[in-house]
Amino acid sequence: MRPIHICLNVRFLFFRPIYACNIDFITLAFAVRKSLFDDPLNPLAIFKTLFLSYSSYTTSFNSHESPCIKSFTNSTLKINIYKILVNLPYLQK
């Protein structure tokens, strides 16, 4: 339940609802959480997960029409990743 709460907060941060992207935020949050549990002392694993997620976002947005394109850019994704990392203590409970 906590990852969903974090993701909704991220969504409202940008003033425009981006409902179609909610599942992506949840998936990203769980991916980061999993990488921490797999090897919590290895920051490289965390950033590898983030990089792969970032790459999949940019690839999908460049190759497909998406309702998220206008309100969701690469720079906002970096902010979203930061927000998820900041809230990781809550995700781990």
Swiss-Prot record:
- One GO cellular component term noted in the UniProt record for this chain: chloroplast
Superkingdom, taxonomy of origin: Eukaryota
Main localization (coarse): plastid
The record's subcellular locations are: Plastid, Chloroplast
Keywords assigned by UniProt? Chloroplast, Plastid
Name listed for the protein in its UniProt record: Uncharacterized 10.9 kDa protein in secA 5'region
Tell me which species this is from: Diacronema lutheri (Unicellular marine alga)
